[in-house]
Swiss-Prot record:
Pathway: Cofactor biosynthesis; biotin biosynthesis. Its cofactor is pyridoxal 5'-phosphate. Pyridoxal 5'-phosphate binds at residues 108-109, 179, 207, 233. Belongs to the class-II pyridoxal-phosphate-dependent aminotransferase family. BioF subfamily. It comes from Photorhabdus laumondii subsp. laumondii (strain DSM 15139 / CIP 105565 / TT01) (Photorhabdus luminescens subsp. laumondii). InterPro entries: Aminotrans_II_pyridoxalP_BS (IPR001917), Aminotransferase_I/II_large (IPR004839), AON_synthase_class-II (IPR050087), AONS_Archaea/Proteobacteria (IPR004723), AONS_Proteobacteria (IPR022834), PyrdxlP-dep_Trfase (IPR015424), PyrdxlP-dep_Trfase_major (IPR015421), PyrdxlP-dep_Trfase_small (IPR015422). This is 8-amino-7-oxononanoate synthase. PROSITE patterns: AA_TRANSFER_CLASS_2 (PS00599). The gene is bioF. The keyword Transmembrane helix does not apply. The keyword Transmembrane helix does not apply. Substrate binds at residues 21, 133, 350. Disulfide bonds: none annotated. The lineage of its organism: Bacteria, Pseudomonadati, Pseudomonadota, Gammaproteobacteria, Enterobacterales.
Length: 383
């Protein structure tokens, strides 16, 4: 089969299953609105949970950083791309989250892939929550280690897998807050099972950091758990992009030597690192923002009980409405867009078959009347 025939067949198959993805050019978005060429929408698809992407102090910090350092890092951190701004941010993150070391990566995807690829060998084993993020599962599947999956958020299932002998090391992998369902992992129980067997726990807290725990330290801090490896990302509550790996000094040194995603990637611009340092300060003092976000979550859940859709067991900013049918989820999304509301449909393979949904996300920037408008639109569609 030639290349064109292969691509045509795959694209036709994707179109026929109501799973076709499209990008749309937008002018800008924030925690409340999305601005497109055809107008302004209420934005219920943003991960900008605290509204920090438009924070004046963070914008100013980036501008000052660009004036001081220029707009790019110029190379890998192993060559020319590691500046004082990067070093200060790493130390700030380590001090804040209670770890000896932090290492910056260009994205959460890169951090998850880089850590797993560097640590695991063919004698090792990865045991992951079956609903873990694609970056974690792909890294595990591509690594030489054996992959086993435990039932979602069930420590008993994990314990059964851990009881099976492994020649090498075992790494248990989960998310702190799950990106598609919004539910929280029982981290204390998972960590206890992991430690009993002398293994390591790696937690991706992309959707917990900034919004959970004291000073926004995340779901691990909230549950009084300190995993051996903690991944935090900056594309959600921080309002920017990038990620960091928190770990002990020996592990950090190992990753500096062996994590190819770190070694061979151009590091984030120093101006971005400086902006992230300001974002950390905003998060640390952001109790009012977190309180406002929680009020919006509570209000949404009260109102959504009246809708003919299934809610997940989520107390976080991620509040999916399970529609099940792929075509219906797309129709709902399009109907909402016609009414000035931006909510995207999430379908397989991002979520399991039969669980298509509207992935609604709430932020501290939303107002109660915004949620009322969303509810009215959803009721109108069903009627």
């Amino acid at each position: 089969m030639d290349w064109s025939s292969y691509l045509s067949r795959q694209l036709s198959e994707r179109r026929s299953t109501s799973l076709w993805r499209q990008r749309q050019v937008n002018q800008k978005s924030d925690g409340r609105f999305l601005y497109a060429a055809d107008g302004k929408y209420l934005n219920f698809s943003s991960n900008d949970y605290l509204g920090l992407s438009a924070n004046p102090a963070i914008i100013s910090a980036w501008q000052r950083g660009a004036e001081q350092y220029g707009v790019g890092s110029g190379g890998s951190g192993h060559i020319t791309g590691y500046t004082k701004a990067h070093q200060l941010l790493e130390q700030q993150l380590a001090d804040w989250l209670g770890y000896p070391k932090a290492l910056l990566f260009i994205s959460g995807y890169s951090a998850n892939q880089g850590v797993i690829a560097a640590l695991m060998t063919e004698q090792d084993r990865i045991i992951a929550d079956r609903l873990s993020h694609a970056s974690l599962m792909e890294a595990a599947m591509h690594s030489p280690a054996q992959l086993r999956r435990f039932l979602h958020n069930q420590p008993e299932s994990l314990a059964n897998l851990l009881a099976t002998p492994c020649v090498g090391k075992t790494l248990v992998v989960t998310e702190g807050v799950f990106s598609m369902d919004g539910d929280c992992a029982p981290l204390a129980d998972i960590h206890q099972q992991t430690r009993i067997s002398g293994n390591w726990l790696m937690v991706d807290d992309a959707h917990g950091i900034g919004v959970c725990g004291e000073q926004g330290r995340g779901s691990c801090w909230q549950q009084k758990v300190k995993p051996e490896i903690l991944i935090v990302t900056f594309g959600k509550a921080f309002g920017l992009s990038g990620a960091a790996v928190l770990c002990d000094e020996q592990t950090a040194e190992y990753l500096i030597q062996y994590a190819r995603h770190l070694i061979y990637s151009t590091s984030m611009p120093p101006a971005q690192a400086q902006a992230l340092s300001e974002a950390v300060r905003q998060i640390q003092s952001g109790d009012e923002l977190r309180q406002r976000l929680q009020q919006n979550i509570n209000y949404f859940r009260r109102q959504a009980q009246k809708l003919p859709f299934n809610l997940t067991d989520s107390t976080t900013a991620i509040q999916p409405l399970i529609v099940s049918d792929n075509e219906l989820s797309v129709s709902l999304s399009q109907s909402l867009q016609q009414k000035g509301i931006w909510v995207k449909a999430i379908r397989p393979p991002t979520v399991p078959p039969g669980s298509a949904r509207l992935r609604i996300t709430l932020t501290a920037s939303h107002m109660p009347q915004d949620i009322d408008m969303l509810m009215e639109a959803l009721h109108g569609f069903r009627s």
